[in-house]
């Protein structure tokens, strides 16, 4: 099995990249893909860039170039669930756009025309991620992750998301675009991210301070998942 791993920022991929054995690099259209092995598992690690367009472009290149069997989206996220703190883990059971609105034509909030209302994550890899959580004894929440081209920093956008998507546990800027492309290709995916900030009026300060913590925690999670795959 080959596992595709996607992070948006340098800080979100650097620890995993350093762990890749027999590493080779592929660059195109501002994206970087690193292939090799981690824990004996074939991986293709993509640094996509920030936002939905960059994520969709990079995911398409990853799926065409490396043809992974599954995609794990890793990195940082803003926490929405009350039980989440910096360094805790979120696992997607589904993802939605929070900034798409074609409700005038009968679609659900966050649903893009011609697309599912939500993109469900792969149940087998959700279970694998949960097993890794149990082994590492980390605090984690499983649920809806929402994505949009905005860093949520302030009461008004936060209230809008919580009102429109009351079940959302985390917010970030790439996961749904990644899932959308995976859906088009028929490739299973799961989002496993660590909390860098709790979405509120000071979230930009928390993000700057705790991004490295989130990167370390999400890297631990991905490595634990890969170790479980290697043991099968």
Curated annotation (Swiss-Prot):
Keyword annotations: Amino-acid biosynthesis, Hydrolase, Methionine biosynthesis
Pfam families in the cross-refs: PNP_UDP_1 (PF01048)
MF GO annotations: adenosylhomocysteine nucleosidase activity; methylthioadenosine nucleosidase activity
Cellular component GO terms held in the UniProt record: cytosol
Binding-site list for substrate: 78, 152, 173-174
Catalytic activity: S-adenosyl-L-homocysteine + H2O = S-(5-deoxy-D-ribos-5-yl)-L-homocysteine + adenine; S-methyl-5'-thioadenosine + H2O = 5-(methylsulfanyl)-D-ribose + adenine; 5'-deoxyadenosine + H2O = 5-deoxy-D-ribose + adenine
Residues annotated as signal peptide: none
EC number: 3.2.2.9
Enzyme's top EC category: hydrolase
Subunit structure, as described in the record: Homodimer.
Family of the protein in this entry: Belongs to the PNP/UDP phosphorylase family. MtnN subfamily.
Record-given protein name: 5'-methylthioadenosine/S-adenosylhomocysteine nucleosidase
Source organism: Pectobacterium atrosepticum (strain SCRI 1043 / ATCC BAA-672)
Lineage of origin: Bacteria, Pseudomonadati, Pseudomonadota, Gammaproteobacteria, Enterobacterales
